[in-house]
């Protein structure tokens, strides 16, 4: 323990010796204006931005030890600067304001770790022009008498600027250059300019804007000038310098015949021109009175002293004098004004309307509507009168009510006139619009102040005439009824209205047009219904249209059109062409059965097909929409068919049902016998194949045959025409053609189809070419005209003899048509046809006959 104490004591003595041997650091003193050193006599502008590097502390240590810098401030002041301890850079951290603090005391220190050297420095804050002038002792108000002499001092303003130098100097000037006032630019004294005057009556208050401006200076590196403004209010004080003034001139008064003595006629008003301090005013009449009028000296009211009937003149020119009385009671300023008083007759009679029996304020008249334009309402006997005289008896007349219907004559009346009312708009006088027209006849005086007026009611009762046509509420009426509606059924009700009254407003209805035969209309109600015997059929005629006429008793009418549509009812079942039909089916090709529903619209005429019974039941399928029947997919040969139904000779019977889609639905059945063969059998005969292809369209076969015949005819015509032109150009005389007459009864020429033969008991229909007789030299009235004539022979070749003229050749025409052969036993064909061919021909005949019947029904 004792050894440790001795070691610590030795270490302390060693440190003391070393400290006495180490010299303290010191600052460099670089003089005034230097930005580094010990901040001696350092100054800084007050507009220096915060964060600026303003100075660098600089010093050294004799031993070369590292040194550090510090700056501190009195606790009662702001810490304006901060220092980098290593490099000595001093930064401004607070804004400077010279007006608040013009110098800053700080303690700077330098240390080498063992020795610390501190110095007290004073930093001067230099001025910048950052303050604006400021007026003191505001607001500024001055009271100035209006008679103050020009150049007199009115007021003094004072402004201070806390800046120093030019930035703290203040000069004054006025913002309004045309002001009657002026200001001394250095002292701020306000004066009334030379030659200027103040007038209380013209302007009681003046507002002077004074601007204080400093001398300018630098701020943040730029030259700036600050200014301030203030307003000086100068109130002008009134003085007695104005004469009295009359208000409301000129003055006119009127005295009427019933004015009583002592009545006030008019009142004059005057006031002191000096309104700030007005004097008392007295009124008096100077001349022109003649004792007829007097005036109240304090109020200025002029009154009449005599009865108007005693006055000698119609117009009096009075002169009223007003006098100011000073506060001492002595007369001061005076003024005079003329007053004109006119004695006039009393307008005491308003205009009055008179009828045949005296004064009347209501006039009535009955008249027909739509009178001629310009017609005078002679039933009105109206007189208007004003008993006053002269201008008092002049008044205007006008009609008050619906405008533009009537006009009144005369429009301006003097004393008395007969009133005439004339029709101006005949169309507006309509009984249907208004049964009663009411007007007011107004008479108003024109040139009188009273504007007396009077009114009289004019009531016009309109009488109806037949001036309207019955009018339907619609131009078209559309109705729909079912086709099975019984006779007498209601269809639609039409309505027409005639605005006229009485018998003229009664409407009677009737119908006309091609479609009106099946319908009737009630003449009074307009209800359209079917004839009791009418039977409607949508399949025959689905739509009707006709016209309805609405007519009044004088024959004025209007027309509307009616459209009636029959709604289809399912009243026709589907119908097959025959109840028993025969078809030939080639393997792989369907046959078709068809039923027709004569209903007019869908779905009543849409037919669905089904097989109700078949023997056997597993052989055929049918398309329910088209009626096509085909073998089931599993049957592809006659052998397969024989395996299913052994013992049958490829002839099957089906019961096919055709059912429409109406409600309720109808159906029909037909027995279909189908003979099935294969394509190999048909391939042996091209014509049979062709007939198989056209079995559902017999017109195709007819078309092919007709085309063949047309080709033959065309070739014949071409050959005849060529021969004719050759003979004509050869200039040869040919013998005249003979006239061919018909033979008594030649056998008809037919083209027989030898390879068609029917195995059934019914004979197949044959087609033959029927030639029409030539247009010339034929006896068309012959009973044998149905027989085909022989074709004329071609002309002989031309001879070599010269021709004296062109021979007129007549080329006969040949026409052909397909007609069925007469019902006589057909000759035996040279060859026998197959059963399929016979069946196809039978089916082709049936369809051809059905198509012919359909076409005849259509045409």
Swiss-Prot record:
Annotated segments matching region Disordered: 770-838
GO biological processes: cell adhesion; homophilic cell adhesion via plasma membrane adhesion molecules; photoreceptor cell maintenance; photoreceptor cell morphogenesis; photoreceptor cell outer segment organization
Those parts of the protein on the Cytoplasmic side are 722-859
According to its UniProt record, how is this protein modified after translation? Undergoes proteolytic cleavage; produces a soluble 95 kDa N-terminal fragment and a 25 kDa cell-associated C-terminal fragment.
Q: Where is the composition biased (Low complexity)?
A: 775-791
Alphabetized UniProt keyword annotations: Calcium, Cell adhesion, Cell membrane, Cone-rod dystrophy, Glycoprotein, Membrane, Receptor, Repeat, Signal, Transmembrane, Transmembrane helix
* Residues spanning the signal sequence: 1-19
Extracellular face residues:
20-700
Q: What's the chief localization of this chain?
A: membrane
| Residue ranges of the TM segments | 701-721
Compartments, as annotated in UniProt: Cell membrane
Q: Which residues form the Cadherin domain?
A: 36-135, 136-246, 247-353, 359-472, 473-576, 573-688
One cellular component term (GO) for this entry is: photoreceptor outer segment membrane
- Report membrane topology: Single-pass membrane protein
Q: Quick check: keyword Ion transport in the entry?
A: no
**Known glycosylation sites:** 58, 89, 296
Q: Name one GO molecular function term.
A: calcium ion binding
- Known function: Potential calcium-dependent cell-adhesion protein. May be required for the structural integrity of the outer segment (OS) of photoreceptor cells.
Disease annotation reads: Cone-rod dystrophy 15: An autosomal recessive retinal dystrophy characterized by retinal pigment deposits visible on fundus examination, predominantly in the macular region, and initial loss of cone photoreceptors followed by rod degeneration. This leads to decreased visual acuity and sensitivity in the central visual field, followed by loss of peripheral vision. Severe loss of vision occurs earlier than in retinitis pigmentosa, due to cone photoreceptors degenerating at a higher rate than rod photoreceptors.
The record's listing under PANTHER family reads: CADHERIN 23, CADHERIN-23
**Complexes and interactors:** Interacts with PROM1.
Q: What is this protein called?
A: Cadherin-related family member 1
